[in-house]
A protein has these predicted regions:
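C-terminal functional modules
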Residues: 16, 36-177
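A small/polar active-site loop signature that marks catalytic segments
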Residues: 1-36, 40-45, 49
Length: 177
């Protein structure tokens, strides 16, 4: 996790009313974005943070007809008047960007918060074990783990409600989306 993400985390906590961090959600958010720009030698952070109009663009499938238009209208500029979910989406979207290319961290944030909005799976081949909108929630136990740690796997599957599937939610994965 880079420094930009470490700064964005207090913004997230502040947004969900964990107080005592010595700043506002906006100040932590903007500091995190600035650090991410600095770490990536990117220019234009002031214009980016002042941008109240740019929203996620539509995806055009160059091969098929699986185009997608994002419903998210979150912009880079902080909005003190936005509701909790809009502020959380803004924070996590920037954390997602700052974490690139750390895919597992981004996936964990998506599962934990539901943000940022991602393109849904077009062809779900899970035979109903994975919700198309929620997407993959966890990786099933491997064959080797099942062989070498049968009792641990059985205990884990029991804690998951008896399902060792990619759609089974982990204990911390409680959001409905």
């Amino acid at each position: 996790m880079d420094d930009g993400c470490r700064i964005v985390l207090p913004a997230c906590r502040r947004c969900i009313t964990w107080l005592g961090y010595g700043g506002t959600a906006k100040s932590f958010y903007e500091q995190g974005v600035r650090m991410s720009f600095e770490e990536n030698n990117a220019a234009g952070v002031d214009d980016y943070l002042a941008d109240h109009t740019s929203t996620p663009g539509a995806f055009a499938d160059n091969v098929g007809s699986d185009n997608y238009t994002f419903s998210s209208r979150v912009t880079p500029a902080w909005d003190d008047n936005a509701g909790f979910e809009a502020q959380l989406e803004r924070i996590i979207t920037q954390k997602w960007i700052a974490n690139y290319p750390d895919g597992p961290e981004g996936w964990s944030e998506y599962r934990r918060t539901g943000y940022p909005e991602v393109i849904p799976v077009v062809r779900n081949s899970s035979n109903g074990t994975i919700d198309t909108q929620l997407q993959v929630r966890r990786l099933p136990y491997t064959r080797d783990e099942k062989i070498n740690n049968a009792s641990g796997v059985a205990s884990g599957i029991s804690a998951l409600g008896g399902k060792d599937t990619g759609g089974a939610k982990l204990w911390w994965d409680k959001k409905s989306r």
